Amino acid sequence: MAQLPLSPAPQRPETKTPGKPEAELIPKPLLRAMIGIALLSLALTTYAVLTGRPHEGVPAPGKVVAEKLVVLKDIDARHATVSDPEGNILLDLPEGGFVDVMAAAVRRSRAVARITDNPPVRIVRYDNGRLAMEDPATGWSTELYAFGADSKAAFERILDMK
């Protein structure tokens, strides 16, 4: 049997042109602008801290009108339960919706703080209309009224339960 000569693999032509630099992935003016924005943000923050400027966007303080301690349990991606501190189930929500989302948020903040048990959270209504959920175990809190009327109503219902 005769053997056929092997031809060398085709060579790719050089894509670089000698003497011409490669194209930049991030143009220098854009890179300078990004660095400028970062430095400006740092300067503004430093100025605000050094001059004692008050915080903006902080909820107005109010007096507590009603509060309730509840234990939120995030069972799975949709299912949540709400119970009192003694363990009596107040609500079993197979389609937990916003309550399940907040239970997952509490669980996450506790995981970050390395808290393994599930102590109660406080649902608090203030005289100025604010409705908040506070986790005494981690110091985490959220303003429930900021998530819309339906989400606020879900926790108002829990707060008003006997």
From Swiss-Prot:
Q: Which protein, by its recorded name, is this?
A: Uncharacterized 17.4 kDa protein in puhA 5'region
Origin, by domain of life?
Bacteria
* Source organism (scientific name): Rhodobacter capsulatus (Rhodopseudomonas capsulata)
User: Which residue ranges does the record annotate as region Disordered?
Assistant: 1-23
InterPro entries of this UniProt entry?
PuhC
Q: Where is the composition biased (Basic and acidic residues)?
A: 13-23
